């Protein structure tokens, strides 16, 4: 990516969970997770422990704790199943260059990281709703289960500049190495690093 796209802002919105910034053609780093990957009681405890910190420090520390917890692979970890991970990865790739530009992605056992730039006319909120709805139906079908698959919300962070973009790619692709699941980013099959290593 040689230059960041010209912003076309849709503004802030919230469904009552996390506030989101639909920034139009601004790259955004997204994390969404399985419904049982992180108990609400743990989040509540962390929020209480961090309540006296400044807001910026509190949010940064909470994000660090969440990421570390997710990397331990708690919960059902349905995405550890290759067929399930394939459904999610294929869904991400399907609308690349149609609804968004997909720069990096990673399907971990209980969560997914995506670095993407929504294309004009495709707000991030609608992209995420479509992606989670489709994959939930398909995964439930092959696992012969019903009910909730994903947490209803997602964490998003817009990319400020080229340096931040490069750091986000590295963070996403290095996640399975950091979690002790493989030795190199390109060893993890359900990732942009693996695809790039295959020349795809």
Please give the residue ranges for each predicted region:
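Short catalytic/metal-binding and nucleic-acid-binding patches
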Residues: 1-200
């Amino acid at each position: 990516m040689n230059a960041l796209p010209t912003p076309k802002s849709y503004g802030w919105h919230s469904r009552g969970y996390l506030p989101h910034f639909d920034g139009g053609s601004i790259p955004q780093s997204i994390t969404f997770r399985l419904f049982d990957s992180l108990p609400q009681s743990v989040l509540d405890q962390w929020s209480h422990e961090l309540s006296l910190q400044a807001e910026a420090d509190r949010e940064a520390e909470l994000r660090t704790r969440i990421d570390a917890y997710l990397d331990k692979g708690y919960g059902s970890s349905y995405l550890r199943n290759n067929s399930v991970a394939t459904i999610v990865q294929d869904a991400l790739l399907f609308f690349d260059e149609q609804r968004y530009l997909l720069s990096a992605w990673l399907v971990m056992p209980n969560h997914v990281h995506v670095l993407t730039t929504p294309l004009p006319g495709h707000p991030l909120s609608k992209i995420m709703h479509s992606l989670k709805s489709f994959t939930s139906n398909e995964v439930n079908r092959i696992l012969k289960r019903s009910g909730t698959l994903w947490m209803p919300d997602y964490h998003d962070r817009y990319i400020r500049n080229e340096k931040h973009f490069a750091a986000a790619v590295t963070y996403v692709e290095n996640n399975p190495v950091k979690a002790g699941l493989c030795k190199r980013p390109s060893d993890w099959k359900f990732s942009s690093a693996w695809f790039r290593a295959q020349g795809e």
